[in-house]
Amino acid sequence: MSKNSILFSILLVIIIMLSMVLLGYSQTPALSSELPKVTWKWNFYAMSIEDEEMAKNLATQVIPAVKERTGGKFIIEALWGPELGIAPANYPKALASGALDLAWTYPGYNIGDIPIIGLCVLPMLVSNTEEYKITAEIFRPGYEKAYEEAYNGAVRLVVQGPYNWAQLVTTKPAKSIMDWSGLKIRVAGKVEMQYIETMGGTGLMTTWDEMVTSLRQGVVQGAFTDFGSMTNAKLYEMCKNVYVVNAMMGDHHVIMSTKSFDKLPKEYQDILLEEMAKAEAYNWSTIVPVNSRFGEALKTWEDNGANIFQATPEELKALSALCVPIWEKIASDIGPEAVLLLQKARTALGK
């Protein structure tokens, strides 16, 4: 073989290898044409894709990518709110039974079955997104184990990310950002009620629809829940006082049916998990934009005549100290593992 022929052969091999890299073959092997067509149902707690930015990010990244990488053979249908007729509190059970394949949910609805995920809504444990991320990473192993144990391995946590900050809005001014005595405040659950009572107020648990009616009728003088939802509901038309305390943020979780997952071809499993991991990383990178969107929402309240009371760093520290008994009681009620995770979080945060 001539020297030129050898050089040509080497060059040809290099060109072929570069082509394979550029076409993605080095990362994603070609899928077999014999792989089956599969359709999954992914239910989202948000009532629509516009309601929750994090849900939108997941849906618009994972679903098209999985479809493209499987040549259109693995389709994931996004279902919003009540389309399947499954209440958010029942998502894990629906996944465990195989009636649902994926669910995006606010885990606060599932604290009854999985008490340890109540750690994500401990009031005043975190006061900014940097602190939130620290605690989320510490708590995640406990959440993964809890989902697995609660549903006998039939439910798996695949994505964890930030939800929205809970703030207090009122029709009647509070005595101070530290003193809510004399106010009846709508809350969504027991943890929120404990926080309101610690601040001297009275918490009343109602549904979302009942909250709006109660505000109009004066049954309650305020609401304590995530600020984005209150803005979307135009509560600024009734509540003219906003107390920015970043009381709790909470998680969103994407949970998956292992029954459905185990039925997938290995190629589909790998692609799905890869795309979920990419979307999760992207969602963490959008924490700063979440803050900017909060600023935009706050301006909407200001433009509608609301008084904005921003907690100072000293007030946030004092509020956090007042809530320590709540953290310790909740963790103790959950069990030793929750106590240990809380200790790790407090050490990491210096609280």
Feature names for model-found ranges:
Residues 1-39, 351:
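Short, low-complexity disordered leader/linker segments with a strong preference
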Residues 133-146:
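Signature of the catalytic double-stranded beta-helix
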Residues 26-131, 146-351:
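N-terminal secretory/targeting leader peptides
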